[in-house]
């Protein structure tokens, strides 16, 4: 007699879809200060970023309200964005300031301006489908290491587009048991803390690439910006670094990933030696991170994963993450409460 196996239905629900509310990293701020407009394919549309003479970086909807031309293909002239199609000129706020062949400017001749901020030498853009600014305290934190000259203030950012839903990336925040199989990094301690818009991970272990005694506390500040502080013994040298892991959605099933690494100088070493150590450590972190990328590129989104008892707080994470996809007044008050979950603790007492 044959035994009929129970069928497991894989749920993958993406519609209707909205893009996450929060700050999203657009990379090194200085790259936008080159006197040119920059194309940004994000949030299911196209934006344009450009800097004015005072150094401020502005982000606007890229499609000209006149005839729909792409403003990111234009030029910058006297702090104005000039459309390549008819040379309409737009100011930093997105308002048309000049039409070369007409004195009267239509009142509707303006394009949307997006809220931006700079922090830690990085540019961020705010997305909120409701059109509201961030609430008090919803910020990208200033890293004190940016004020410390013992750190090499270079993020060494890599950029790539990945064809999967951004939640696949965020799931890693609670995935204690992939470190061994994917990274060769046995986990000795792993915990998560969720509080408001911040999701923390505390990791201890030993890494084949990044050295022994690895301690790596990290946090998502909103849905898309993740900083990790790393300390480890790398080739007999105590190394301290900060990783940047950020993404901006392009479509519901693709995102631009920015991965960066900033390293602290080792006392007693020359600048050349420190640069070599930093280069090696950045390479090691990059290789480790790309092991995750290889998985993300070839997996699908599953909304109802079958979990083992000790898989960690996957559903709690997704509940936390979901708050960024709903109207703010519908976010449960319980999201503000501190929740701590320890998944692995093999430390010797």
Annotate each predicted stretch with a short phrase.
Residues 1-12, 45-47, 84-88, 161-165, ...:
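A broad, low-specificity signal for short, low-complexity segments enriched in glycine/proline
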Residues 3-7, 11, 20, 25-146, ...:
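Rieske [2Fe-2S] iron-sulfur-binding domain
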Residues 12-13, 18-20, 182-184:
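Non-catalytic accessory segments flanking enzyme active sites
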Residues 15-16, 39, 115-117, 247-249, ...:
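A general structural signal for short secondary-structure junctions and capping/turn motifs
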Residues 15-19, 121-129, 246, 250, ...:
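Short, mixed-charge, low-aromatic patches
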Residues 56, 134-349:
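C-terminal catalytic domain of Rieske-type non-heme iron oxygenases
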């Amino acid at each position: 007699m044959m035994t009929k196996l129970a069928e497991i239905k894989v749920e993958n629900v993406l519609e209707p879809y909205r893009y996450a509310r929060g700050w999203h990293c657009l990379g090194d701020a200085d790259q936008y200060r080159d006197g040119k407009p920059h194309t940004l394919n994000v949030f299911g549309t196209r934006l344009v970023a450009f800097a004015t003479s005072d150094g401020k970086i502005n982000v606007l909807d890229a499609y000209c309200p006149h005839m729909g031309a792409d403003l990111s293909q234009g030029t910058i002239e006297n702090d104005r964005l000039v459309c390549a199609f008819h040379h309409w000129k737009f100011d930093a706020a997105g308002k048309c300031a000049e039409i070369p062949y007409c004195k009267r400017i239509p009142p509707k001749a303006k394009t949307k301006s997006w809220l931006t901020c700079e922090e830690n030498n990085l540019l961020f853009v705010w997305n909120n489908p409701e059109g509201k600014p961030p609430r008090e305290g919803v910020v990208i934190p200033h890293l004190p290491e940016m004020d410390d000259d013992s750190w090499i203030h270079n993020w060494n950012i890599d950029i790539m587009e990945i064809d999967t839903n951004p939640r696949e990336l965020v799931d890693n925040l609670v995935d204690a048991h992939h470190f061994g199989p994917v990274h060769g990094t046995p986990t000795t301690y792993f915990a998560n803390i969720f509080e408001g818009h911040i999701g923390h991970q505390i990791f201890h272990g030993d890494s084949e690439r990044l050295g022994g005694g690895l301690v790596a506390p990290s946090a998502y500040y909103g849905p898309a910006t993740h900083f990790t502080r790393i300390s480890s013994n790398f080739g007999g040298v105590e190394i301290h670094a900060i990783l940047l892991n950020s993404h901006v959605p392009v479509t519901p099933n693709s995102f631009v990933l920015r991965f960066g690494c900033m390293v602290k100088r080792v006392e007693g070493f020359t600048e050349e030696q420190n640069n070599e150590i930093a280069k090696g450590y950045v390479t090691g972190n990059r290789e480790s991170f790309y092991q995750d990328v290889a998985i993300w590129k070839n997996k699908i989104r599953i909304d109802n994963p079958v979990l083992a008892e000790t898989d960690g707080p996957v559903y709690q994470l997704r509940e936390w993450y979901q708050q960024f996809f709903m109207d703010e007044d519908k976010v449960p008050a319980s999201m503000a409460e501190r929740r701590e979950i320890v998944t692995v603790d093999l430390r010797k007492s």
